[in-house]
Amino acid sequence: MSTVVIIGAQWGDEGKGKIVDFLTEKCDYVVRFQGGCNAGHTVVVGEEKYILHLIPSGILHKNKKCIIGNGVVLDPSGLLKEIETLTQKGVEIDNNLYIAKHCHLIMPYHVAIEEQSEKKKKIGTTKKGIGPCYTDKIARNGVRMIDLLYPDVLKNKIRANLEIINFLLKNLYNAETLDETEILTQYLNYAEKLKKYIADADILINKAIDSGKKVLFEGAQGTLLDIDHGTYPYVTSSNTIAGGACTGAGVSPRKIDNIIGIVKAYTTRVGEGPFPTEIKDSLGEEIRKRGGEYGATTGRPRRCGWLDLVGLRHAVRVNGFTGLAITKLDILDGIEKLKVCVGYKYGNSILEDFPKEIQILEDCMPVYEEFQGWKESTAGIKNYEKLPDNAKKYLKFIEDSLKVKIQIISTGQKRDEIIIKESPL
């Protein structure tokens, strides 16, 4: 098998970065296919902690080709800061990073309009301009990476967009307008620094696959934040599910061999939106502290709750997972009783399928099965047989309920704190 897609199976923050980092050792290419700098992938190598927002996690390995695909919306300023930080730490960027020509760019007016609209309609965005950038993409008004190399095209697009945006900022939001010349100068400066990375990414990826290279597709956020299949409107602005790897990188579904769902051993969510299994007492706070559940991008505390099999069954269905990776199992060490949601109570009915109506989901109560916890530490365990019996029972229940095999179990933050039951590559 030469290709694998890594997908978050919950509301993001499942620990995808570590799994991608681990699997990259066996890969030749790592491709980011959607999202923007609203994602934060944390990877710990030795004593060094890296937080990556745009560049694929594979960049931390030598001689791995990392590609930012056309499905990503890219903030040039954020990317340059990330490149600078990694370079200062001795990471080689120049020969290993490629950016799709038709990747869309986040502009200052995207950030400005999102900041203003979020004041009126609170969804819980990161205020990074992600949504407005995708809006321009769909409306066919977007600025793309390749436009940086054509100053007249860039100037005309900025001017046309500012006519609308400045009108809204001034008349609807009573906010400061933006200067066309200032933005153009800023982005032409970015062009000089980034032009060496611009490439026909889809051609590179397909040639790599066709020649037998191993390619890993790295998703951002999670299934329940998908624009179509998530808890709309409390979602991100892109397709976070496995199908997004094909559209966001330019590859055929026939070229995808494995799809791995990343599942945190409990559930977290950042920002607004329904969360049926949320733990609102001191245990929720304890899990947050143990797991370091604070956003890598915003620093916002994550809401914590029990594992939700209803949401996970939905994720299995829309992604077609061939395997699962369970993360943060060690965070549950020492908790006397564990709960797993197996259904939702809605009125007099028990729902086994994830509701598409947000108003129904908001009124759902979780139906739990309880499990005896384990007192022994699982931290750093690398052999499945050495896990406590109750931890194995917990994992077996997940596997049996979802009818998908668990291939990987993460038992800590560090790269080598991991159990491989079966390699997806």
From Swiss-Prot:
EC number assigned by the record: 6.3.4.4
Residues annotated for Mg(2+) binding in this entry: D13, G40
Highest taxon, organism lineage: Bacteria
CDD domains reported for this sequence: AdSS
Enzyme class (EC, first level): ligase
Binding site for substrate: A296, T297, T298, G299, R300, P301, R302
GO MF annotation: an example: adenylosuccinate synthase activity
Biochemical pathway: Purine metabolism; AMP biosynthesis via de novo pathway; AMP from IMP: step 1/2
Binding site for GTP: 12-18, 40-42, 302, 328-330, 410-412
HAMAP family for the chain: Adenylosucc_synth
Protein name: Adenylosuccinate synthetase
Native organism: Thermodesulfovibrio yellowstonii (strain ATCC 51303 / DSM 11347 / YP87)
